Amino acid sequence: MATTASPTPAQLQAVISPREQFLAAFEQEHATTMRVLRAFPADKQELQPHAKSKSARDLAWIFVLEMGLLEKALTRGFDWSQPPGGSPPAPDLATIIEKFDEGHKRVADVVANMRDDQLVETVKFFVAPKTLGDIPKIQFMWMVLCDQIHHRGQFSVYLRMADGKVPSIYGPTADEPWY
């Protein structure tokens, strides 16, 4: 089997801006998350593995909320004089998937049109329990993306519990072997 050498971080940084690096990862992770969400059996959306766990539908809604959070952080910032809140979850996974995809496209467009100097501007966000701090926008962008990856991991466990087929994420799964 042939392998190709990946460029070193220094080589990448010389040709790809931090904004472009983020967008490439953002698109790749979005495509993977969409595969996982679409694989979930619609008739099992209320699956709740534990009393303290969210239902699958509520967990999927986090992806939509985070796109709104990211768009707001990059365009307007937050008004912390009002308690944070989100809209209630959509009634079904199909709507959630559609809203997540729409939100992703809006955020990708915002990021694509940002200048690199805007990435170091800060946004007020939580840095510890009940503690706000200034976070560079680029760091906030990566934090949200990493949080989505975390929730996708949770959702993939729900998917297995719902007897769905877990698609490849970073490698083969029992349902999608690579060899």
Residue locations for each model-derived region?
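Solvent-exposed, charged/polar functional surfaces in cytosolic regulatory/catalytic domains
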Residues: T32-R35, A39, E102, R106-N113, ...
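Short, low-complexity N-terminal intrinsically disordered segments enriched in polar/charged residues
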Residues: A10-E20
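Helix-adjacent hinge/juxtasegments
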Residues: K72-R115
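Acidic catalytic patch
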Residues: N113-A128
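Soluble or luminal CAZymes and related metallo-dependent hydrolases
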Residues: P18, A25-E29, K99-G103
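Active-site rim elements
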Residues: P18-L23, A90-I97, M141-L145
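Short, contiguous alpha-helical
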Residues: A2-A5, P9, L23-E27, A31-L37, ...
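Short, solvent-exposed, charged loop/turn and helix-capping segments
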Residues: F40-D43, D116-D117
